[in-house]
Structure formats: structure tokens, C-alpha cells
Amino acid sequence: IADQAETTDILCTHPYPLFTPHCRIDPVNTMRNAFHAAAETRLYGDVGNVPAFVEEAGSLGPCLSSERVAADYLRNMLWNSYAHDCRGLLWWCGHDQTELPHTPYDWVGMERCLGLLRTDRSPKPVMEELGKFGRMAAKLPLPAFRRDAVCILSQHQDQWGVGYLSFLLAKQAGFDIEFQYADQPLKPSKFYLLPSVTGTWVISRHRWMELLHAVEEGAVL
């Protein structure tokens, strides 16, 4: 993530629960998946230190959810992404593709019914939710997103899994976190998390001493 951010002005995510570890174990419109897009996009933006947005999201069609559930899922994803300073969200895709005979629509049934519009061009509930949210967001700008703690993702761990579940647990505990890798300069904070350390290669000595100094100055680890 950090390497990519050095060469691009913005980072983007494709947060599909079905294809993402730690997400494909709950129904679509439940807490874990409602926060997936926001958590992954904040991880990219925080670690990369650049703006990030949800460049492609969707329900993957009726094989995973009804049209109404997909709309509820999108509404949660929009609100959570907006509240967490994710800079935009694009839904895949514009139209259902039930009449196309070529690949990937011939190969994979899941690809045929992903649109905001049905084949007859009638709008699905997801399109209505997208329109309602866009009109609301234009009238309701939010203040700067406040973070209460820095979550340090250490070396030789499942950084996405640890970061994602730390994000969810922090939400349930009533605070918000900012991400960084252990090999990045320590972000200033009064509250640090160093969750789920594993193995013998966790954090460099100089970064650890920097963290201990922050604790001596009053921060909580």
C-alpha cells in the first residue's frame, strides 16, 4: 500500500465481501460487511497517507442478496464511507447484462445482474438509495473525521485481518482508529494499539523505544 501511494495521488479499493478474507462469513447486510468498505479504504488512505475512495463496490447480484437487501447494504456502506472520510463510492455497474452472449456473461451467472438498472431499464432500489444519498450529501457536509487512537500493524502478522477486526472492535467500544505500519514514523496520539503481535519480528527497536517514550509522556498503549 505504502509503495503504491508513492506513485499515485489517490488509492482505491474494491471491497467485495465474497472475495475478501474475514468478510465472507456473515450475511451481506450485517455489521462486519457494512463496515468493510470504510475499514479497507481507511487502511489504504492511512497507510498510504493519501486520499482513498471506494472505486468499485456491489452486491454481486441475486446469488448473494435480494434487491432490497442490496439497497440496505449500499445505504450502510454509503453512510459509513462518508462518515470515515472515504472520498467517493462507485457502484458496479450501470446496467444488468442478461442478454449479452459473450464472456464473462456467458461464463459466470453472477456477472449478469449487477446493475443499478434492470435489463428493461427500470431502476432497482440500489439506484434510488444512491440518488437519495447523493442529494443528502450535497446539503450536509461533515466536519473533519476525528480519530481517537493509532492502530500499529506489526510485521509478520495478517495485517488486513488484524486491522479490520481492530476497527470493528474499536467501533463496538465507542472509538475510532487510524492505521499505520510498524515501520512507518510514529503518528502522534494519546492512545496506541499494538494488537495481535505474533512471531519474533514485530517492531524495530528504535520504533519500540519511540512508542515507550510516548507512553512516558502520557500516552496509553
Which sequence ranges carry the predicted segments?
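Carbohydrate-binding surfaces of carbohydrate-active enzymes
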Residues: 38-39, 43-221
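Aromatic- and acid-rich polysaccharide-binding/catalytic face
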Residues: 1-34, 87, 191-196
